[in-house]
């Protein structure tokens, strides 16, 4: 295993250890094969596009007077589902808390959750972009992507 492969393996392991990713991400990786070598990247790219839109919608909805908590909850529910489907564990967890604040119609709690959600999402996005960059570098050298044990 060369330096880049080790770096990729360690980065991915850290994402799991730090709770950014869960087993659902591993399940996505198992669906990737020679016929769809960029499957995970494509799924995550769609997740990012949807998440960017949902976070914007939540931010806009929280700024409305009066606040429509049902609408915000629907956005948080959608974000929770898409996050869970790609294995974004920490984002999923914040969404669950966010939904509780929506149900309680706690505006300040919702605002804090949105900030936390944006923070967790930004961290995840940065870490996944780095993971994909390492994978591309490894492929460019004709090496195989190491699998997680």
Predicted segments with their positions:
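Two-component system phosphorelay core
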Residues: 1-149
């Amino acid at each position: 295993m060369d330096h880049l492969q080790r770096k990729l393996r360690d980065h991915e392991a850290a994402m799991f250890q730090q709770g950014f990713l869960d087993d659902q991400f591993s399940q996505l990786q198992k669906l990737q094969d020679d016929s769809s070598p960029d499957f995970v990247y494509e799924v995550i790219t769609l997740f990012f596009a949807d998440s960017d839109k949902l976070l914007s919608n939540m931010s806009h909805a929280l700024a409305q007077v009066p606040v429509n908590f049902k609408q915000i909850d629907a956005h948080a529910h959608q974000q929770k589902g898409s996050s869970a489907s790609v294995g974004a564990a920490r984002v999923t967890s914040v969404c669950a808390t966010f939904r509780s604040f929506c149900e309680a119609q706690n505006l300040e709690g919702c605002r804090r959750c949105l900030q936390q959600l944006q923070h967790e999402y930004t961290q995840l996005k940065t870490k996944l972009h780095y993971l994909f960059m390492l994978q591309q570098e490894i492929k460019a050298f004709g090496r195989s992507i190491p699998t997680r044990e």
